[in-house]
């Protein structure tokens, strides 16, 4: 189960997702932070706000994020059958649930209305025809999912695994999208007041990793 959970973390870090292209295209190029001077049209489309559903970066990100959802669903569905303590199984399921919630949140805030898939795939075409859910419905769904497993998450002891503080930070962000300012402040304050996190120096922020200011980072290895 832990190996499968590591697979969900791996999918989050995919090149088409948090590993690079999703944020190159979805955030930076579509804003005025950077501009594109190369020859690849799928980057240029974002820089000029002329992208379509056929854009390669968009399709890569779509598949990569739903691959993360699928892997998390596999963990959630199969973990109850493993030979381990209930505490360990519940924590694994909780981590996978938060990972799935982040992926569904990213899909909704990027594309708007999306199909919400919360079951592992067992047959080809199983989810053909699944209706889209409105973005606000998706946001509330993932909030409910996170809160349902919150108490099974561990406390903050490292910066590369999902824990209660990671869930707090994600909840704060989702509540911002719902314009629920009170709950956004509530969960953000929980992170701010956690002594495990504090501001770091500008040099560490730029050149370092896993600094005291980092709530959650995806781990990479050269192996």
Regions found by a protein language model. Give the residues of each.
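Acidic, glycine-rich segments characteristic of secretory precursors and extracytoplasmic regions
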Residues: 1-25
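Conserved, well-structured interaction surfaces
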Residues: 6, 10, 41-111, 151-157
């Amino acid at each position: 189960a832990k190996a499968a959970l590591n697979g969900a973390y791996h999918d989050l870090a995919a090149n088409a997702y948090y590993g690079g292209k999703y944020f190159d295209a979805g955030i930076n190029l579509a804003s005025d932070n950077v501009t594109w001077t190369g020859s690849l049209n799928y980057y240029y489309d974002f820089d000029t706000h002329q992208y379509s559903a056929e854009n390669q970066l968009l399709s890569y990100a779509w598949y990569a994020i739903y691959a993360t959802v699928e892997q998390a669903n596999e963990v959630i569905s199969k973990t109850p059958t493993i030979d381990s303590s209930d505490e360990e199984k519940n924590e694994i399921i909780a981590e996978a649930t938060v990972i799935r919630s982040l992926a569904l949140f990213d899909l909704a805030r990027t594309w708007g209305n999306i199909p919400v898939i919360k079951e592992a795939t067992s047959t080809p075409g199983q989810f053909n025809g699944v209706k889209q859910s409105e973005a606000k419905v998706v946001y509330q769904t993932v909030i409910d999912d996170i809160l349902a497993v919150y108490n099974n998450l561990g406390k903050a002891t490292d910066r590369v695994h999902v824990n209660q503080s990671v869930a707090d930070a994600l909840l704060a962000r989702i509540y911002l999208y719902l314009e629920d300012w009170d709950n956004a402040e509530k969960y953000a304050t929980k992170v701010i007041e956690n002594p495990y996190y504090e501001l770091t120096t500008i040099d560490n922020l730029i050149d370092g990793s896993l600094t005291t200011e980092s709530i959650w980072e995806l781990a990479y290895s050269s192996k």
